[in-house]
Amino acid sequence: MAKRSGSNTTTPTDEAVASERAHEVASRLRLAVARLHRTLRQHADSGLSPSQLSALVAIERHGSMTLGELAAHESVAPPTITGVVARLEADGNVAREPDAVDRRVVRVTATPQGRAVVVRTRERKDAWLTQRVAELGADDLERLADALQVIEALGERVDR
């Protein structure tokens, strides 16, 4: 809360201004992150649709997953994830395997080819972003590094 100069009290106006500023900054941050995400996705050049790449990255990161687990992780309906996995499987990026404990359950795992797609995609995104960051002046680079500390802290608060 903002305090009046020389006072231990805040005014409704101070709180409203602070709240409005927080909303403005949050909106700009959300838009900037979305724009950067979209641009990185365009430079990934993975040959996969965004939903296929997202599912493949989730499988590669979390290991073997059931279709239900993957659908929940991706926040999509099971029939949607079934189609995504079918395409990934047809392209050789994932394999379906019976669960070791319950043979009725099918698990999806990334193939070596699928893992290579994820690695290659990350490398392309990192290379593009590294080039953009390297073009910044020294002052902007330091401001970005400082801002990242705040952004990372925001992310940690959300994860709690």
Where do the protein language model's features map onto the residues?
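Exposed, interaction-prone assembly regions rather than primary DNA-binding/catalytic cores
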Residues: 142-160
